[in-house]
Amino acid sequence: MRLLITRPQPDGARTAAALAAHGHEAVLAPLLRIEPVAAAFGRGPWDGAVMTSANAARALATHPRRAEIVALPAFVVGGRTSEAARETGFDHITSADGDADDLVRLIKRQSATALL
């Protein structure tokens, strides 16, 4: 089967490889490009950083305040985001292993109040 993959990179390539492993032909045609910006986060202090996607974790890799941010505990939605957070430099990562609702419940259980 020939399939059109519209995800941005590098996720599109990963999806294409998984499909190829099952005998499908993937055509990569990303519909958007993820462009990190150096957002101003304010002074803090923060109890942790929340990431709902691997793209969010990847964006922090080039942020001017990266060293300060990766020193925080990270609360992430799932496995891919956890992996990206680790690659960005986070050492203390807690994953909800689910969806955004699971992440909210996890954060409430951790009693974190000031989150980035």
Regions found by a protein language model. Name each.
Residues 1-116:
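Signature of uroporphyrinogen-III synthase
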